[in-house]
Amino acid sequence: DLDTVEPMIALPYHPSNAFPLREVIAEPEKYAKWVEEQAVKIFENTPDIHPNLEEKIVPYTDAAHALSDAFPIDRRIRVDQAAIAGCAAGSFENIYAVEQVAHESKKALGQFAFNVYPASQPIMVELNRIGAMNELMIHGVRVKTAFCGPCFGASDCPENNAFSIRHSTRNFPNREGSKPGQGQVASAALMD
């Protein structure tokens, strides 16, 4: 029964750092601190690396309060980049589901770098034929050609100290393209 499956997020810097997404949303400070503690251990021999996920925690403003004083009702981890890519994650079903969320929300999804890579050209053609690609682009999502790059850090490399969420098939240290030996690191979390 798929209704019993809980959405998870694999936090930086290892795929085993998986937690229920609802917990991370409910307690962002706790999990940001935990990620930073892991980074201290992982990058202990790289003194120039200072990831700061706690600075990504910002007030969240509900749309219902947007016309008032932008009343903060909660705090969330600000996402700098998102990508849906790869042979498994770029499926017709996944991208169509994102289009449905965009259509129902009536909000821009591309307020940060959000890239979608269909798994194949035939998938892209079909999503385009039914109007899903146009809907995503109207909502600010950048639609790119089928490409394996985001899965192994060959494209969509986040900026230094950025927080990136990704729905892709691979997860290993520095998989998003970070170069800790050169003083650059980003925090990538996988979502399924």
Question: Language model features by range: what are they?
Answer:
Residues D1-M191:
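Fe-S-dependent hydro-lyases/dehydratases of central metabolism
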